[in-house]
Amino acid sequence: MAINNFCYMFERGHKRERPGADELYYVPGLFLKLYFQLNKNSYELKSRYALVELQDKTENTTIFEATLDNIGNEKPLAKQRFNDSEISSIVDNFFYTIVSNYSMQSFVDDNYKRQIYFYADKDDINRIEQKKEFIDHDCKAAYPHSWISPIFHKNDGYIRSLVLNPYRHNGNINLSNEFKLSKERVASLFISIDTIDIPKRYFFRPYKFSHLEIKLNAKKFQYYLDDFLREFENINNPRPIPKESLILDFLRKTNDDFGLAIQNIFKLPNLQTEEIKLNDYEKFENFCYCVAYIKLKLYKITKKYDAYKDFKEVLNLHYGENFVQIEGAASQINDLLQFVLKDPSHITKKIRRLVNFLCLAKGTYLKKITKKNFTQYFNEKSVFYNADGKTDEEPIEHRPQTADDYLSPQIYDDCLPPALFDWELYLNKIDKNENIITDEMGNPIEIPYNQMSSGEVQFLQTFSIHAYHLMNLVSISNKSGRPKYNNFNLVFDEVEICMHPEMQRVFIKKIIDLLVDLETGNNNSYNIFIITHSPFILSDIPTENILYLEDGCAIEEKRRKPTFAQNIGDMMYSSFFMEKTIGEFAEEKLKELIRKRQGKKTHMSDQEADAILKSIGDPVIRSLIEEIEANDD
């Protein structure tokens, strides 16, 4: 909550500039001091009702101070809104926190509802409790809100200091959607690791990227078109546009203003349309559907998002029996497309994927995307890659291997198959010598992501969330003018959920391998915070780095046991405060067996007693019970 309030203070007033991010809420009434160290300096983040303050205690300086406007007895400070340059100076002295927790009982919205404040602008007048309150001020919401909800959304360009994972809506995780998102994260990570020749420890071992298999799903285009026409033309049951009509319409409009602008500015492959045979649909349908989708998406963006309000009247829509036509003035269309090129937000993500896919395909009917496709593509320069400010003409493999010089997973995420396609990620397995494992016929073993076990998927989901965000964060250039974090706090809450014990055992080593890879040419700092009940994880952590809790309180130091390289079975009992070393039901049966062998009255039959005695796994316990004889007395 303290970090949320801290972020609110320096982020307020930027809603229009970051349209993809949900606005943060400020939670008043919090009195807390958070202490941390960066390098050799000690810091204090202080929250006192409506005041948030960050101090360097070593230098005895105040780095950041802000209050809510005219709230309680707080005196408003002169500074209310901070630009990105000022935010950069603030976060230089703070850290970025990435939290993962897959427990269904965690982060439920209703448990985090509080009276909150929000930053109101002219569009928020209906949400203001007292209509007389000023706009562009902190205003009290009319009813309690869940302050935790906006932190799940990661569309702020990594400005805020905190993100929670996985995404929850009203406390619920959409498992199907999370699986889809995890596949995208895992794919972009594997591709980025394999495509760029940086020193690798293969923290995803034993897996390695093989390829993506893709197939156009024309029904997805029709569904999107139906929704589009319902929204903008109020047509509830539009007729399906036949594939032939779509391609013919595309061929007719290839050289219109809109078509030329899309091809020229996005640098799409130049199709020789006069040579296209109309019965050769398969070869060109990918291109036709993608360009048609780009047109629809551009129209929708200009009508829907405030960031594109200056282009709201640029495009005009015409709908007929067998066509949907979108057109506009050439100069205005060019301005729109140039604006799209410079927009890295989620708004244009689908367009980026469509354009990048068409450039990867090079005018062919692409069914498989391999490492070779990506390497060639980025060496030839992506239009969006250039637009992101990375204009170095030197091939990727010859560049210095630092965070400022290699591409982030976000770039590769933008090159995954567009929404019109069904696709699957295939992985190879590698041995300890990094050799790909083959089957009996000598063919590489290829494992589709959707056929992996739930434990394997859980491991990749948890790991990829942190790896994905970290690799994006460290790839932000110091020259970009954007706030850049150099200190990271990784929080793995209940990390062992659904994981196989062996995956728990190697988890710490995997994290270390990841951080070693990320630190190639960098100077970042990391704090790893794990909340766990797993002795498999505890065995890799020194005792002095562990905080033991019992009933919410830290236990006495004399009760702590050495953990590093400790026997995992022994730690299950000693480090997690278990009262017994065997199950409760087994204990009851053993007590009843002992009473029977002592000749006392029980409900246990002789046959059951013999069966239980033979089933005892501990040979010492079994031997001791066998020595018990009936008491003749």
Region spans (language model):
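RecA-like P-loop NTPase motor core
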Residues: 87-96, 106, 141, 147-156, ...
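Extended helical coiled-coil dimerization/tether regions that scaffold
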Residues: 115, 122-145, 149-489, 519, ...
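Amphipathic alpha-helical scaffolding segments
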Residues: 2-14, 49-59, 178-189, 463-468, ...
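Long, solvent-exposed N-terminal ectodomains/accessory regions
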Residues: 40-60, 68-76, 80-84
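Acidic, metal/cofactor-coordinating or nucleic-acid-engaging core segments within structured domains
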Residues: 104, 108, 479, 506, ...
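Switch/communication elements of ASCE P-loop NTPase nucleotide-binding domains
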Residues: 1-13, 422-575
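Short polybasic amphipathic segments
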Residues: 28-43, 52-54, 210-213, 423-439, ...
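Conserved P-loop NTP-binding catalytic core
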Residues: 2-57, 90-91, 95-103, 109-111, ...
